[in-house]
Amino acid sequence: LTCVKSDSIWFPTSEDCPDGQNLCFKKWQYISPRMYDFTR
């Protein structure tokens, strides 16, 4: 899984996380980063 580390709209950063630890979706990073901020 890929987790969003920064909620920046223009320059979101991500990192790989163990499955089940953090449920973030890379495809949503540039659309609504804050939407998945609560999953971290």
Swiss-Prot record:
Its main location: secreted. Expressed by the venom gland. GO terms for molecular function: toxin activity. Contains 4 disulfide bonds. It holds the Pfam family Toxin_cobra-type. Belongs to the three-finger toxin family. Short-chain subfamily. Aminergic toxin sub-subfamily. Binds irreversibly and specifically to M1 (CHRM1) muscarinic acetylcholine receptors, blocking further binding of antagonists and preventing the action of agonists. This is Muscarinic m1-toxin3. The lineage of its organism: Eukaryota, Metazoa, Chordata, Craniata, Vertebrata.
